[in-house]
């Protein structure tokens, strides 16, 4: 069953990428006949694919069925209500029930209210794994939330994924604030570094992982620059560290003075060289050379 849901999700994702939702209705009907579970919903992330189709499609039948599916799946995420909750709901005054959003939605002839509620339900599906961020009236914090949400909108990944970038931005900011407890320079620098890394064109996977929930907001709020770096940058840092270790080894051994090498910078022959085994034992050693005149360094195998 999981393979079937994954297959449908992949097809929908391709439709969103190609901006062609032809055949989406048939896929949605297939999903409707599949008994969905919470585990299946979380492991396949089918909700994101359905929400992306819902947002892109102009076919009323497609959007209506997508909304219906998302609404039914939302109940799985919320969990079953207890008997106590049911009893309390029965005891509520009739006037309260009539004034509730649910009652107004059922009795109202306006489709605007209904569509807004469905939109909220759909967006809630993807942030329900984490508690919603508390509201704030602090202007600095509100501005930071806006900037984080804007950074999450870099590219169009959030559309295909179906993530609520505004809520995610608020959750990230809330986690930062809860750790630092004020909006001083440390707080601003933390927010600024998150924004910079989310916008990094060379590191799109970081943004996608945050939008998909692979990196939770509270973890992302605490990540170091090294942890947020792209794979390319991590590899570069690793190589630089190795190089620094080799140079340190060369400095410790002192080296051998020679006139066999000519400095490419000052053309003098007053040099010191050291040989270090940097690769496997059956390969040639690497020779590190330092010019004693100008300090120029080079190496060769």
UniProtKB/Swiss-Prot annotation:
<comment type="function">
    <text>Necessary for efficient RNA polymerase II transcription elongation past template-encoded arresting sites. The arresting sites in DNA have the property of trapping a certain fraction of elongating RNA polymerases that pass through, resulting in locked ternary complexes. Cleavage of the nascent transcript by S-II allows the resumption of elongation from the new 3'-terminus.</text>
</comment>
<dbReference type="GO" id="GO:0045893">
    <property type="term" value="P:positive regulation of DNA-templated transcription"/>
</dbReference>
<dbReference type="Pfam" id="PF08711">
    <property type="entry name" value="Med26"/>
</dbReference>
<dbReference type="InterPro" id="IPR006289">
    <property type="entry name" value="TFSII"/>
</dbReference>
<dbReference type="GO" id="GO:0005669">
    <property type="term" value="C:transcription factor TFIID complex"/>
</dbReference>
<comment type="subunit">
    <text>Interacts with EAF2. Associates with UBR5 and forms a transcription regulatory complex made of CDK9, Pol II, UBR5 and TCEA1/TFIIS. Part of TBP-based Pol II pre-initiation complex (PIC), in which Pol II core assembles with general transcription factors and other specific initiation factors including GTF2E1, GTF2E2, GTF2F1, GTF2F2, TCEA1, ERCC2, ERCC3, GTF2H2, GTF2H3, GTF2H4, GTF2H5, GTF2A1, GTF2A2, GTF2B and TBP; this large multi-subunit PIC complex mediates DNA unwinding and targets Pol II core to the transcription start site where the first phosphodiester bond forms.</text>
</comment>
<feature type="modified residue" description="Phosphoserine">
    <location>
        <position position="100"/>
    </location>
</feature>
<dbReference type="InterPro" id="IPR003618">
    <property type="entry name" value="TFIIS_cen_dom"/>
</dbReference>
<dbReference type="Pfam" id="PF07500">
    <property type="entry name" value="TFIIS_M"/>
</dbReference>
<dbReference type="InterPro" id="IPR035100">
    <property type="entry name" value="TF_IIS-typ"/>
</dbReference>
<keyword id="KW-0539">Nucleus</keyword>
<feature type="modified residue" description="Phosphoserine">
    <location>
        <position position="97"/>
    </location>
</feature>
<dbReference type="InterPro" id="IPR035441">
    <property type="entry name" value="TFIIS/LEDGF_dom_sf"/>
</dbReference>
<keyword id="KW-0479">Metal-binding</keyword>
<keyword id="KW-0832">Ubl conjugation</keyword>
<dbReference type="InterPro" id="IPR017923">
    <property type="entry name" value="TFIIS_N"/>
</dbReference>
<keyword id="KW-0805">Transcription regulation</keyword>
<feature type="domain" description="TFIIS central">
    <location>
        <begin position="140"/>
        <end position="256"/>
    </location>
</feature>
<comment type="similarity">
    <text>Belongs to the TFS-II family.</text>
</comment>
<dbReference type="GO" id="GO:0008270">
    <property type="term" value="F:zinc ion binding"/>
</dbReference>
<feature type="compositionally biased region" description="Basic and acidic residues">
    <location>
        <begin position="76"/>
        <end position="93"/>
    </location>
</feature>
<feature type="zinc finger region" description="TFIIS-type">
    <location>
        <begin position="259"/>
        <end position="299"/>
    </location>
</feature>
<keyword id="KW-0597">Phosphoprotein</keyword>
<feature type="binding site">
    <location>
        <position position="263"/>
    </location>
    <ligand>
        <name>Zn(2+)</name>
    </ligand>
</feature>
<protein>
    <recommendedName>
        <fullName>Transcription elongation factor A protein 1</fullName>
    </recommendedName>
</protein>
<dbReference type="InterPro" id="IPR001222">
    <property type="entry name" value="Znf_TFIIS"/>
</dbReference>
<dbReference type="GO" id="GO:0003677">
    <property type="term" value="F:DNA binding"/>
</dbReference>
<dbReference type="GO" id="GO:0005634">
    <property type="term" value="C:nucleus"/>
</dbReference>
<feature type="modified residue" description="Phosphoserine">
    <location>
        <position position="57"/>
    </location>
</feature>
<dbReference type="GO" id="GO:0006368">
    <property type="term" value="P:transcription elongation by RNA polymerase II"/>
</dbReference>
<feature type="region of interest" description="Disordered">
    <location>
        <begin position="76"/>
        <end position="139"/>
    </location>
</feature>
<feature type="binding site">
    <location>
        <position position="294"/>
    </location>
    <ligand>
        <name>Zn(2+)</name>
    </ligand>
</feature>
<feature type="modified residue" description="Phosphoserine">
    <location>
        <position position="81"/>
    </location>
</feature>
<dbReference type="GO" id="GO:0005654">
    <property type="term" value="C:nucleoplasm"/>
</dbReference>
<dbReference type="GO" id="GO:0045944">
    <property type="term" value="P:positive regulation of transcription by RNA polymerase II"/>
</dbReference>
<feature type="binding site">
    <location>
        <position position="266"/>
    </location>
    <ligand>
        <name>Zn(2+)</name>
    </ligand>
</feature>
<keyword id="KW-0238">DNA-binding</keyword>
<keyword id="KW-0007">Acetylation</keyword>
<keyword id="KW-0862">Zinc</keyword>
<feature type="binding site">
    <location>
        <position position="291"/>
    </location>
    <ligand>
        <name>Zn(2+)</name>
    </ligand>
</feature>
<feature type="cross-link" description="Glycyl lysine isopeptide (Lys-Gly) (interchain with G-Cter in ubiquitin)">
    <location>
        <position position="55"/>
    </location>
</feature>
<keyword id="KW-0804">Transcription</keyword>
């Amino acid at each position: 069953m999981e393979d079937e849901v994954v297959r449908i999700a992949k097809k929908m994702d391709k439709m969103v990428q190609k901006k062609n939702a032809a055949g989406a209705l048939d896929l949605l009907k297939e999903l409707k006949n599949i008994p969905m579970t919470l585990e299946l919903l979380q492991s396949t992330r089918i909700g994101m694919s359905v929400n992306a189709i819902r947002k892109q499609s102009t076919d009323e039948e497609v959007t209506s069925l997508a909304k219906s599916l998302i609404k039914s799946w939302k109940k799985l995420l919320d969990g079953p209500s207890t008997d106590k909750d049911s009893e309390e709901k029965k005891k509520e005054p009739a006037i309260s029930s009539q004034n509730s959003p649910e009652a107004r939605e059922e009795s109202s002839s306006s489709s605007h209210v209904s569509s807004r509620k469905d939109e909220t339900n759909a967006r809630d599906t993807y942030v329900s794994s984490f508690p919603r961020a508390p509201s704030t009236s602090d202007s600095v914090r509100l501005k930071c939330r806006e900037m984080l949400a804007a950074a999450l909108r870099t590219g169009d990944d959030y559309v295909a994924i179906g993530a609520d970038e505004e809520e995610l931005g608020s959750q990230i900011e809330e986690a930062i604030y809860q750790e630092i407890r004020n909006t001083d320079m440390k707080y601003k620098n933390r927010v600024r570094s998150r924004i910079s890394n989310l916008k990094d064109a060379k590191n799109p996977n970081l943004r996608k992982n945050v939008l998909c929930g692979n990196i939770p907001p509270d973890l992302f709020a605490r990540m170091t620059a090294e942890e947020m770096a792209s794979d390319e940058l991590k590899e570069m840092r690793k190589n630089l560290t190795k190089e620094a270790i080799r140079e340190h080894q060369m400095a410790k051994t002192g080296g051998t003075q020679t006139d066999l090498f000519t400095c490419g910078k000052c053309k003098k022959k007053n040099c010191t060289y050291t040989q270090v085994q940097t690769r496997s034992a059956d390969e040639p050693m690497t020779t590190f050379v330092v010019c004693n005149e100008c300090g120029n360094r080079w190496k060769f195998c």
